[in-house]
Amino acid sequence: MSYKQQYAQVLHDVIGDALSQEEIEQLIEQPKHEDHGDLAFPCFQLAKAFRKAPMMIATELAEKIDNPLFSNVQAAGPYVNVFLNREVVSREIIKRVLEEQQAYGSSELNGKTIVTDFSSPNIAKPFSMGHLRSTVIGNALNQISRKKGYEVVGINHLGDWGTQFGKLMVAYNMWGKEEDVRSEPIKELLKLYVRFHEEAEENPGLEDEGRAWFKKLEQGDEQATALWTWFREVSLVEFSRVYEMLGVSFDSLNGEAFYNDKMQHVIDLLEEKDLLVESEGAMVVDLEAEGMPPALIKKKDGATLYATRDLAAAVYRLETYGFEQAFYVVGGEQALHFKQLFAVLKKLGFENVDGMHHVPFGLIMKDGKKMSTRKGRIVLLEEVLQDAINVAKQNIAEKNPNLANAEQTAREVGVGAVIFHDLKNERMNNIEFDLEQMLKFEGETGPYVQYTNARANSLLRKGAYDGSAFNGSADDYSWGVVSMLNQFSAVIDRAFTRREPSIISRYVLDLAQSFNKYYGQVRVLEDDAEKQSRLALVKSVTIVLTEGLRLLGVGAPEEM
């Protein structure tokens, strides 16, 4: 039970039935200033029931509260502020962190599932910087959801279908070489795709050939299917290299093609409920009552659309996973598409639709412009990550030339810096990409948090930390750190509820700053009776910093 819950229980015992314990808990605040206590209860909602002014109620309640958990209880205007007993609370929190280790802050749920649709690059196209945000936000949400006790199904809804494959087949048959594609798949396939469009300007008949090849693919033609399968496989090999660098994995790679034979099922469901209406020759679902334009399901020529495929995917996932929630980590420009998707699913009578969420995000900017191309070419994510690793290598060589595991540490610091920089910003904000800035060891960066954690681990080694010697006491300077450790579980809850990984990023930055302040005030390694207790606090910080970074998908090297 959290201290907030315990305070709510104490208040409920005094107040009686005017408010439930849950209502009291929701009203309790955390004061912004330390001299206002650790928890504050506003009395406004009791005024009617007690027929008294909130200030008078606060004074009376403060006089009645007597509990060893609180060292001081004060009425401050209409608030009842309590100060936690620092010795008792410090002992409890540090003991809990040391006992629970990585499980500290976790929740337990029985078999509830969350499905996350994230990353979703297009096959045979470069894995550009444009895919970074969906990939790292989705991965962080998965880690946070697992921490909350959910079973998570991470889906990479690959863009592996469409007329572009017909064009690619024409281009490959005309100009491609197998050995070139095998050696540099994405580069060669992109080159062929670009050449197709250049040649098609002179020879428009190529477009018809492209359509014809895609039709062959749709009809299951052996040669077309073999080429499509190969393009998909070589692309995935290249993508998997980037995912490995980022430490991201998926439970399903079912992309657009997987739903080819599942769209009719959705169309049948829509017809059964009389939801399909004709509009200018096309088949649509009318969403006028929902204040939206109609959802286009079938074009005039009978061809299905992106929306039909997404409906088929949603229905398949609802029927297969029976999820409680689903997150679609996709850019904000798709907002209407998802509103329509959820509205159609509601009309079909699916119960879990309220748990389906579009999780949009802002753009990556470079010098105030959208970072999609560099000197007219696509900025490849793998190149950016490699650049970051190289800069991290240089920084480590300057700071610690004899570091034993320098290569692995540079990967964790370099890649971690890119991920952390993305996730320290609220996801709806555009982010400015500045490699030099994000790799600094000071300021609001991933390396700053990692370096703080490495420094804490160094103290444990130098001080010969012995976990069994913790006697539970904590000094006056440690309270800022202890109260930060206490917030970890609530921070995870907030990040999950808002689908906002930046809440975790801000927290690990604040915890790192709080620890560095403590380190500057206290001689941690002084050989006295309290040394092991101080080191127990340091150990608790390393556990929570490491776990907080893990939730973001960032490594925590023990030495830097």
Curated annotation (Swiss-Prot):
Gene3D superfamilies: Arginyl tRNA synthetase N-terminal domain (3.30.1360.70), HUPs (3.40.50.620), Isoleucyl-tRNA Synthetase, Domain 1 (1.10.730.10). Disulfide bonds: none annotated. Pfam families: Arg_tRNA_synt_N, DALR_1, tRNA-synt_1d. The keyword Acyltransferase does not apply. It comes from the Bacteria. It catalyses: tRNA(Arg) + L-arginine + ATP = L-arginyl-tRNA(Arg) + AMP + diphosphate. One of its GO terms (biological process) is arginyl-tRNA aminoacylation. Keywords: Aminoacyl-tRNA synthetase, ATP-binding, Cytoplasm, Ligase, Nucleotide-binding, Protein biosynthesis. One of its GO terms (cellular component) is cytoplasm. Its EC number is 6.1.1.19. It is found in: Cytoplasm. GO terms for molecular function: arginine-tRNA ligase activity; ATP binding. SUPFAM superfamilies: Anticodon-binding domain of a subclass of class I aminoacyl-tRNA synthetases, Arginyl-tRNA synthetase (ArgRS), N-terminal 'additional' domain, Nucleotidylyl transferase. A motif ('HIGH' region) lies at residues 121-131. The keyword Nucleotide-binding applies. InterPro entries: Arg-tRNA-ligase (IPR001278), Arg-tRNA-synth_N (IPR005148), Arg-tRNA-synth_N_sf (IPR036695), ArgRS_core (IPR035684), DALR_anticod-bd (IPR008909), Rossmann-like_a/b/a_fold (IPR014729), tRNAsynth_Ia_anticodon-bd (IPR009080). Monomer. Belongs to the class-I aminoacyl-tRNA synthetase family. PANTHER family: ARGININE--TRNA LIGASE, CYTOPLASMIC, ARGINYL-TRNA SYNTHETASE. This is Arginine--tRNA ligase. The lineage of its organism: Bacteria, Bacillati, Bacillota, Bacilli, Bacillales.
